[in-house]
Amino acid sequence: YAFGYPS
């Protein structure tokens, strides 16, 4: 999870 996106 990074920058509000999955994975």
Curated annotation (Swiss-Prot):
Modified positions (Serine amide) in chain numbering: S7
Subcellular location: Secreted
GO biological process: defense response; neuropeptide signaling pathway
Domain of life: Eukaryota
Keywords: Amidation, Amphibian defense peptide, Endorphin, Hydroxylation, Opioid peptide, Secreted
Record-listed Hydroxyproline modification sites: P6
Tissue: Expressed by the skin glands.
MF annotations from Gene Ontology: opioid peptide activity
Protein name: Dermorphin
Biological source species: Pithecopus hypochondrialis (Orange-legged leaf frog)
